[in-house]
Design a protein with these regions (language model features):
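Short, charged/polar surface micro-motifs in flexible loops or helix N-caps
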Residues: 33-36, 46-49, 69, 113-114
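Short beta-strand His + acidic residue motifs that chelate non-heme Fe in jelly-roll/DSBH
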Residues: 53, 72-73, 89, 95-102
């Protein structure tokens, strides 16, 4: 199966009460994850914008940083993340991501079910 870029659902939205809007491109729908996940999305966080702090139940979310730099809040511990880093937020844990740089932050988000 191939999903072309033209067939991806795109949306600009405030995510989890974060700052500003985040640009999202769903790489597949929930059905495409065959019951094992609910999100597989390319995300662009513009400078000054963020994904607000939130928790995951009963699921785990992965962020793979494609480009840029972000401030990742990992259960209250803030860590600067860069291209190539992977952030994991497990069941019952909380996180957020903020772009404090002058360049867009690009990442892939994948949520898998426990």
């Amino acid at each position: 199966m191939v999903t072309t870029s033209e067939n991806c659902v795109r949306r600009d939205t405030c995510v989890q009460n974060g700052k500003g809007e985040v640009h999202m491109k769903d790489l597949t729908d929930k059905a495409g994850l065959y019951g094992h996940g609910r999100l597989f999305t390319h995300i662009v966080v513009d400078p000054g914008c963020s994904v607000g702090y939130h928790y995951h139940h009963p699921e785990t979310e992965f962020y793979y940083i494609l480009k840029g730099e972000g401030l990742f809040n990992d259960n209250g511990k803030e860590v600067i993340v860069h291209e190539g880093d992977v952030c994991v937020t497990g069941f019952g844990e909380g996180h957020s991501m903020e772009n404090q740089s002058q360049e867009p932050l690009e990442m892939i988000a994948l949520i898998v079910m426990e």
